[in-house]
Amino acid sequence: MSLLQSALDFLAGPGSLGGASGRDQSDFVGQTVELGELRLRVRRVLAEGGFAFVYEAQDVGSGREYALKRLLSNEEEKNRAIIQEVCFMKKLSGHPNIVQFCSAASIGKEESDTGQAEFLLLTELCKGQLVEFLKKMESRGPLSCDTVLKIFYQTCRAVQHMHRQKPPIIHRDLKVENLLLSNQGTIKLCDFGSATTISHYPDYSWSAQRRALVEEEITRNTTPMYRTPEIIDLYSNFPIGEKQDIWALGCILYLLCFRQHPFEDGAKLRIVNGKYSIPPHDTQYTVFHSLIRAMLQVNPEERLSIAEVVHQLQEIAAARNVNPKSPITELLEQNGGYGSATLSRGPPPPVGPAGSGYSGGLALAEYDQPYGGFLDILRGGTERLFTNLKDTSSKVIQSVANYAKGDLDISYITSRIAVMSFPAEGVESALKNNIEDVRLFLDSKHPGHYAVYNLSPRTYRPSRFHNRVSECGWAARRAPHLHTLYNICRNMHAWLRQDHKNVCVVHCMDGRAASAVAVCSFLCFCRLFSTAEAAVYMFSMKRCPPGIWPSHKRYIEYMCDMVAEEPITPHSKPILVRAVVMTPVPLFSKQRSGCRPFCEVYVGDERVASTSQEYDKMRDFKIEDGKAVIPLGVTVQGDVLIVIYHARSTLGGRLQAKMASMKMFQIQFHTGFVPRNATTVKFAKYDLDACDIQEKYPDLFQVNLEVEVEPRDRPSREAPPWENSSMRGLNPKILFSSREEQQDILSKFGKPELPRQPGSTAQYDAGAGSPEAEPTDSDSPPSSSADASRFLHTLDWQEEKEAETGAENASSKESESALMEDRDESEVSDEGGSPISSEGQEPRADPEPPGLAAGLVQQDLVFEVETPAVLPEPVPQEDGVDLLGLHSEVGAGPAVPPQACKAPSSNTDLLSCLLGPPEAASQGPPEDLLSEDPLLLASPAPPLSVQSTPRGGPPAAADPFGPLLPSSGNNSQPCSNPDLFGEFLNSDSVTVPPSFPSAHSAPPPSCSADFLHLGDLPGEPSKMTASSSNPDLLGGWAAWTETAASAVAPTPATEGPLFSPGGQPAPCGSQASWTKSQNPDPFADLGDLSSGLQGSPAGFPPGGFIPKTATTPKGSSSWQTSRPPAQGASWPPQAKPPPKACTQPRPNYASNFSVIGAREERGVRAPSFAQKPKVSENDFEDLLSNQGFSSRSDKKGPKTIAEMRKQDLAKDTDPLKLKLLDWIEGKERNIRALLSTLHTVLWDGESRWTPVGMADLVAPEQVKKHYRRAVLAVHPDKAAGQPYEQHAKMIFMELNDAWSEFENQGSRPLF
């Protein structure tokens, strides 16, 4: 029987009930359905959609035919949508151009056989879709202008009826497939499943989350080809209302006239920009051209209203003497008189779209052959059968091709920037990008010219992409650190500059938020856009909506500010956050009456403050309070994250002093962009990250940070990458492969940019002065510390080869050089000359231009020739004097002869050598005038000592205090200033200390004299760190214990003119390695007074390094390597570290490593006299006792934070509860631990309990036995009326909770 059934199914027509497609609905066919007074017999299936089926039903009494729509729903949301559709149809029914509503009914899922709620919708039966009739007429030529006029006019009449309702009903899914042809030949509009009365008015206050929700809802109810620009681009902030139906009507009119859709492929960019074309040689439909243009306006406010459209159509009809309301009989006549033969069948059917259950409409073949089956084959059905087989095969092939094409999730933002999701391995690769497929794709399309940037915390083997992977991820649900984001942009820019074929491939986990932040920042970094909205918009169009948070957009705006025409450089001033104020009080309590907030503050990845306390000690703010204030009083600098939580008390948490926390929101910003005179930083509701549901935040909710910007700069531990970088030369053309591509992108996305939305930048209130944000570049010399950040362990930067980058201090370059040396040996690429190492380093730089190399040779000649120092001619002074040199900044410039000293500016820098590093003079703003290759600047090279240049002015005046510090240049004398005290601090006039590498010094001036004969002492100026507030007064103290053997040591073979570690001559434009300590310790060297008391001579360590010694008169670079440079290497090679010394190393106060490298990189440090004596804690007790201090610390006081908390808790806590808390500490719900220590918490006089050890509680049976014994011993019923009754209750509760946890975990044995 089953074989016969299968044969019948095969022979059945595609629309019949015997096929597989109709088997699920066959039980409904043939049944009798009662809807009110009508008894209907279901005859056959007309169509089926996503969750609805359309049947032909006949009234048993009158024989009239209807269309019965059966909708199935298993979700409450679908139920509401179906009910809304029924309501709209009832409201709109009666119009001649809208499908007539007859009746409706529903049953719940409990009564339904399908297990889903069922809805029945009865409407008139129509002949079929208009599109089917139009297809029949295609072979006969285009439609006449009068036919188009009648079809479109009747459609607009239906839409006008919808828009006249109160409130207006928006169809939202107008398309030619939803236009039916009635029995009488009139147009009928159907499918109101997507209709709505809600309009949206986006503005700058909308958050990204709100936009995403609206976009998702609209996308679910619209068709791609008919979507409007304001729907696709919600960031345009155009209103979304009735005018979206006008756009769809324009598409329908275009389709009726020219037989093709204006946006056939549904391309978003073409729709957003309104890029369509009317055939230039069309003369038949000229009367409609202006109407099409007026309806397809990108700005919805410029489109015609439906009343204006109908009015223009009436004028056209009057001019052509046509009645637009008359039936369109020409369609029925040209289709063989199909309509007249069946007019007695009754009203035509409604047809629903996919959104409401029916997607395709009623096919004409189903009317021609309503009962397909075996007779179809005899009447030519064989042809249709094989046609269907062919169509099915082609669809299968197309779906397989689409799957293969879409299997690789990669999108090109430009031809040189690609974004993809995480390249997965193993089982995960079946769902995501397979890493092998990604590699094959990139190798075939960009062989040897792509670099991968991994922004996710997960990693994979870099060898999969030929060791060209940069690991630069950051924590999830946060914005990246500003220096990390800047370094990524700079590295991508350097990689794209090296070769016009190079591309950057960026990925995070899903290729959305994190990738969008990096890519959009890079687009702004290259000055393609000047606002974050424009960059995010391009990313959304090219890939997908990124779903970024306000803090993400805020950091993209930071990048825009830093590369603007008037750049804003983040200042280095700390900020005191006094309090966090929330107004009004957010509603996070269970009663929605207020909140109990506490705050956590993070600087970078480190938590620096928390206001969390015991639940009862934190204030509960109510709505009546008006605002919630959290006092902080914490000083922060850099990337700051403030997280606000709501504290909730949990059941049983009172006993264990625990509570639950619920995140309310978080804020992330960089302190360098807070104006100096700001007192309040305001964040509106749309500026907050990680927000909860909107009902918990009252209207006009905002968060204010009460801040105070400290007047002095605080040097950072590492020099920020933007410190002296020049933004000249940044051009968006680097993002594109051709000029045509650039012009195409500019034509699509280069529209006038909107002003910034307030979601990306906070508002500031100033206490005094101008409320506008001042320039945020630092007033004092920034830090030049040599710490290498964690990011530089995976990304090593090389500056561009143009004159566009500012000078960087030599110490940071030396540390980067050390990092690059570490990587050079381990870098092995399977492609020759791969630009990035296995740890994801910077690509190699191209060879220098000949002109640049020649310029560097000339610079080296300055160091090769020994010339006596020539005093410059006196120069006239100008009036304004900068006595403290606060306007100087670190810069490097070309070496100039002494006579080249020009007249100084009005600011005379008198203390430049005391408060800032020695600098080279420049003729203009501080720029890299020599355009050195970063390879030559990889190690500290000695600049000539010329006065520092004030910002934006000519060289500074003479420095009368310059001789107080060691000589730092070839011409050691400042202009017209004798070195009066040079011998006090210099061991020799020609000896250059390690921390101040320079060319050989000139003879001392005649007026200089070593009055105290201290010149023979081996100095150690490397200890003298510059600081504006705390100078290192004892910087050279340890020089007494150092050996002077190195002062006369022979020069290594590599020494001559200046050499960098790579073996190449170092240019003079690099700066001296003078670091500024963040917290200088003037007594840092006291512990090393006797570091070398054995008198053994100091020798040179292996590797050519000279530790802590002064260079020879001919010495150039203080640190050198004897290893020859690798051929074609982009980084200097690394010298192997020497064996470690046995002596105790000096204390290191740097956070990561020293400016001049780690101890193993500098070699063995030979002791001079003797080892350091060990200092005990009582060595200074006599000094302390004489001054009235106790010689010994108080041993009774708390030593840990936990002990301090216990003491604080003991002040207002019941001693009994305190004893119990001590017992359960670290043993919460651990039955074995509680039983083994139960004897420590029992009351006095309890003798029934015998202590047990952990060895007696191994097996579950043993635990159960001793638990029962413990319960019998401490049961509260046995302690009734006793003074220890409450004590017994608390012990019993803890044991009971622990036993329940033990059973829930399966009563597992201990081993």
UniProtKB/Swiss-Prot annotation:
InterPro entries: C2_domain_sf, DnaJ_domain, J_dom_sf, Kinase-like_dom_sf, Prot-tyrosine_phosphatase-like, Prot_kinase_dom, Ser/Thr_kinase_AS, Tensin_C2-dom
PTM sites of type N-acetylserine: S2
Domain spans labelled C2 tensin-type: 572-710
Tissue distribution: Ubiquitous. Highest in testis.
Polar residues: compositionally biased ranges: 967-976, 1070-1080, 1109-1124
Keyword list, A-Z: Acetylation, ATP-binding, Cell cycle, Cell junction, Cytoplasm, Cytoplasmic vesicle, Golgi apparatus, Kinase, Methylation, Nucleotide-binding, Phosphoprotein, Serine/threonine-protein kinase, Transferase
Species of provenance: Homo sapiens (Human)
Phylogenetic lineage: Eukaryota, Metazoa, Chordata, Craniata, Vertebrata
Protein name: Cyclin-G-associated kinase
Region (Disordered): 709-729, 749-788, 801-860, 913-1035, 1047-1150
